[in-house]
Curated annotation (Swiss-Prot):
Protein name: Protein PIN-LIKES 5
Lineage, opening ranks: Eukaryota, Viridiplantae, Streptophyta, Embryophyta, Tracheophyta
Gene name of the encoded protein: PILS5
Matches recorded under InterPro entries: Mem_transp_PIN-like (IPR004776), PILS1/3/4/5/7 (IPR045033)
Keyword Endoplasmic reticulum attributed: yes
Organism from which the protein derives: Arabidopsis thaliana (Mouse-ear cress)
GO molecular function list: auxin efflux transmembrane transporter activity
One GO cellular component term: endoplasmic reticulum membrane
Side Cytoplasmic, residues: 27-45, 95-106, 166-229, 295-312, 359-370
Signal sequence annotation: none
Predominant cellular place of this UniProt entry's protein: endoplasmic reticulum
Stretches of the chain found on the membrane's Lumenal side: 1-5, 67-73, 128-144, 251-273, 334-337, 392-396
């Protein structure tokens, strides 16, 4: 498979995303005015509550069986490593470049969370369909490759809606805390500076008693709050959809209820799939709509973009090659080179589109997110081609 053929295959899904983003940008422009901020916020809530959970459920229920979980056990581990290593590298980028606090979570998220959704779903079968595909029989390659990509998509959604969701939520809480502290500072500066000194002295013993009580209850309170946060994240609609889909896929009798031509409740799966198909187009045009405002007012510096590009398209693929080849030499992976290709590809993908949904949901850095997505997806056209060529050379 030549470089130019691979360039065409690898660039198609990325160009598709860019075209859909341009549609959203045009609809949100001053000339068109069909997609204002209020419309984008409302659509984003529909994606979060309905479309994304349906997509997670439909993909996991259809593609994941207990046998697949056992034989493909390294894929969840590999994906966890992409999030862990990408998060650490993103943290280094934050420490080196020192961006504004509200951008820190976004930078770590874009470095760690790759687009495990529509890109592998399009890219892997497309490589199988090529006449000179190195992965053998076209129909077998396409069927198996689509299963790998679908499993990757479902797992990626689970990681993104737990780990990445927490990062963006943390940034939003940090911004909220800064705003509240500024309000308190303004109020205290406007308060009566001539207050009675004796009042403060009389209040001191009571303050000390309250402090002791708070210290005693602080540990348990923190533990309860931490468990409450975990429960909230697990009950987020996309995560809940992934968990239910995982259960239906792994339990055979539940799977037989909704999967298959003769399944009595097959309408549930077909409805979920139909709703889930709206996720990627809606997320992409929302991202494009935010892009107009982002290009006008974004605070993203070129060095931040360069740092993320270096992490996603230089450091991560090199580390991924080392991890996958080491795992193969240790006998952890199936002999199928297509499986190993998908594992390497997970280290090379541009940032997840779901990040845009999260920033819109919490109203934090959505303009900057659109700008980062634009540049990373433009670079992805060449990066995916070059690294796919290297992966195929190493595996075949």
């Amino acid at each position: 498979m030549g470089f130019w053929s691979l360039l065409e295959v690898a660039s198609m899904p990325v160009i598709q995303v860019l075209f859909m983003s341009l549609v959203g940008a045009f609809m949100a422009s001053d000339r068109c005015k069909l997609f204002p901020v209020e419309a984008r916020n409302s659509m984003n809530k529909v994606v979060f509550v309905l479309f994304a959970p349906a997509l997670m459920f439909a993909n996991l229920a259809q593609t994941v069986t207990l046998e697949d979980i056992i034989s493909w056990w390294f894929m969840p581990v590999n994906m966890g490593l992409t999030f862990l290593i990408g998060g650490l590298l993103g943290w280094l980028v934050v420490k080196i470049l020192k961006p504004p606090p509200y951008l820190e979570g976004l930078i770590v998220a874009t470095c760690s969370a790759g687009n495990m959704g529509n890109l592998p779903i399009i890219l892997v079968p497309a490589i199988c369909d090529e006449d000179k595909s190195p992965f053998g029989n076209r129909s077998v390659c396409r069927t198996v490759g689509l299963s790998y990509a679908s499993f990757s998509m479902a797992l990626g959604g689970f990681y993104i809606w737990t780990y990445t969701f927490r990062l963006i939520k943390g940034s939003a809480m940090k911004v909220q805390a800064i705003e509240e502290s500024e309000k308190i500072a303004i109020k205290s500066s406007n308060s009566d500076l001539e207050a009675d000194h004796k009042t403060h002295l009389l209040g001191a013993p009571e303050d000390k008693e309250n402090k002791v009580v708070k210290e005693k209850t602080g540990f348990w309170r923190k533990g309860v709050d931490f468990l409450h946060e975990i429960l909230e994240e697990l009950l987020a609609p996309p995560t809940l959809g992934a968990i239910i889909g995982f259960i239906f896929g792994a339990v055979r009798w539940l799977r037989n209820l909704i999967i298959g031509d003769d399944a009595p409740l097959r309408i549930v799966q077909s409805t979920a799939k139909l709703l889930g198909d709206g996720t990627i187009p809606c997320m992409t045009i929302i991202l494009g709509g935010n892009l107009i405002q982002g290009l006008r007012s974004s605070a993203v510096k070129p060095m931040v973009v360069l740092g993320i590009v270096c992490v996603r398209y230089i450091a991560m693929p090199i580390i991924g090659i080392g991890i996958v080849l080491t795992a193969a030499n240790l006998g952890f992976l199936p002999a199928d080179p297509l499986f190993q290709y998908v594992l390497m590809l997970q280290f090379t993908l541009p940032p997840a589109m779901n990040i845009g949904t999260m920033t819109q949901l919490y109203n934090v850095a959505q303009d900057e997110c659109s700008v980062l997505m634009l540049w990373t997806y433009l670079v992805a056209i060449l990066a995916l081609t070059v690294w796919s060529t290297i992966f195929l050379h190493l595996l075949v």
